[in-house]
């Protein structure tokens, strides 16, 4: 998919060439609270954050933020563990600073790529590459060391932004249509 104003080949680069790979720090489910600092736990990537872009952080903790890893706008997070290799290949874009990132999260931090574009690509064509490097049987693990050699295709930053905006608009449209379908199913079952 190309927009007419862009041309030229996309560059192929390993993640380690444009991202710093970090790991979150421990926040357990029982340390969540109704107040405090916004935080994201790895399990929430499977349950609360279904879209590539996290539009709102839904959890908080009162833990001391100075001892934990904080997000920076443009971070992409991927779980470090999961039940299957394909499940673990789940990337989410964090468009906020200072969100506390839980311990079982890989953090891809870059100011050279658009984070939402990266999340869409990691959940698309690269999902199977990520699943291939995950390790384990009953519990699958994935760490920065495994991610660093995944090859990503990158257009210029302006094209990354335009593509990710289009994909985000499509996600919003799909969510709206799904809500309409759910409402119609409820109406139908009430008759």
Label each PLM-derived region with a short phrase.
Residues 2-25, 149:
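Non-catalytic DNA-recognition/assembly elements of restriction-modification systems
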Residues 99-105, 135-158:
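A short glycine-rich beta-alpha junction/loop motif
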Residues 1-8, 176-191:
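Short amphipathic coiled-coil heptad-repeat segments
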Residues 159-162, 187:
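Short, solvent-exposed linear patches
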Residues 1-4, 162-174:
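Hydrophobic structural patches
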Residues 2, 62, 106-110, 149-154:
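Short, well-ordered beta-strand elements within core beta-sheets of diverse protein domains
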């Amino acid at each position: 998919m190309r927009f007419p104003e862009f041309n030229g080949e996309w560059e192929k680069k390993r993640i380690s060439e444009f991202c710093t790979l970090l790991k979150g720090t421990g926040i357990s489910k029982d340390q969540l609270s109704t107040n405090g600092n916004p935080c994201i736990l790895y399990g929430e990537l499977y349950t609360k954050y279904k879209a590539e872009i996290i539009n709102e952080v839904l959890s908080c903790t009162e833990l001391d933020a100075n001892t934990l890893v904080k997000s920076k706008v443009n971070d992409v997070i991927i779980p470090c563990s999961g039940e299957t290799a394909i499940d673990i290949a789940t990337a989410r874009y964090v468009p906020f600073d200072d969100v506390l990132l839980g311990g079982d999260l890989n953090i891809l931090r870059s100011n050279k790529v658009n984070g939402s574009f990266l999340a869409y690509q990691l959940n698309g064509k690269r999902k199977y590459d990520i699943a291939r490097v995950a390790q384990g049987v009953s519990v699958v693990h994935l760490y920065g060391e495994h991610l660093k050699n995944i090859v990503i295709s990158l257009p210029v930053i302006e094209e990354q932004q335009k593509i990710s905006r289009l994909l985000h608009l499509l996600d919003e449209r799909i969510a709206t249509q799904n809500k309409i379908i759910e409402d119609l199913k409820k109406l139908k079952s009430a008759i």
